[in-house]
Every structure is written in C-alpha cells, then in structure tokens.
C-alpha cells in the first residue's frame, strides 16, 4: 500500500483539523493509502516529520494555513525532499489555497489530490527562505505572528484586520535594499510585498 505523510498544525483555523482527522484517514484508506500523521508543536522539530520518509510515500499532505505550508516547504527544501505536496486548507486565511481555487471540503479536497496528477508551481526565495504565497517586509507584515492564538481562533480573519488597525497607529517607513536579477532598489518604503498568489 502507498503511504501518505500528513503534517498538520492542530492550532490552525480554530483547531478545525482535530474534528476532521477521522474523515481524512477514512477517505485515504478507501483509496488504498496508509496515512502517517505528524502533529506540529513547539516541542517536536518539524524535521522529525520526515525521518522515516522513503520511496513508499506517494506525497506529503500539509494541513494548516499559509504559515504551516511555508514552514513545511522550507524544511523540505532544506532536506532536499522532492515529493509532491497536497494542501488541505484548514488555516484561518488560506490565501494560497484560495489562489489555486482548492476545495475547502475535506473529502472533496482529498479526492481532488488523489485523482489529479502533480503540477509544478513557482516558489520564491528571499535570502535563504523560500515562500509559496507571499514575501513581505515592513508595516503589517508580522501581524499574524503578533496575534494571540486564542484570539485568532475565536475571531477568525477579523483578528488580522483588528491587529492591522492597531499597527497602523505606529506607521513609520524604513530603509530597504532590494536586489534581484531585474532590478536594484535602495530607498525608503512602508511596505513591500512579493506575491506568488493573488492575495496576502
């Protein structure tokens, strides 16, 4: 039987994944897959999720929001793991899943992953960090990191807007140097965004 590694963030999106695990396992089993879970938390390094990875694994299923997807992507690149990923959008915002028009129904999402073939997508790199959705610097860019998890889980997307308004009260520019193959920019700005999707 083929294996699938699911790396999931139990705190994403009002902890919605916790109530969906049985449906995820049941759906994969009905297609002849063995699902091997890895629960993300502060105590377990994310690299440990891939200790047992071998050719028996068909793909990596990432369950969480944009931050979880970025974390797993960076570890996979660091460890030179070249396996297809499936995204189960169970986070608060899920901007990248929205950009790809991925289904949010768990069963539909899994069946979509199983019944489709892998497709290549671009990923970006800033300094030594990869990103799949957006790279940002300046005002509002650390809003999601500053939000209390319980507040975010209870308020959902609204929590980002509330924190953003709070941050706007301390608006100030910063000096930046951007160097790419096409352009070099040195100057002041309030916010810089590099999109791989449609929103951030």
Identify what each model region corresponds to.
Residues 1-63, 74, 108, 183:
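ATP/NTP phosphate-donor binding region
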Residues 12, 69, 92:
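Short, glycine/acidic-enriched loop or turn micro-motifs at the edges of active sites
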Residues 62, 70, 194:
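Redox-cofactor binding/interface segments in oxidoreductases and associated redox assembly factors
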Residues 68-80:
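Short Gly/Thr/Asp-enriched flexible loops that form oxyanion-binding sites at enzyme active sites
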Residues 198-200:
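Short, intrinsically disordered, charge-balanced linker/junction segments flanking boundaries
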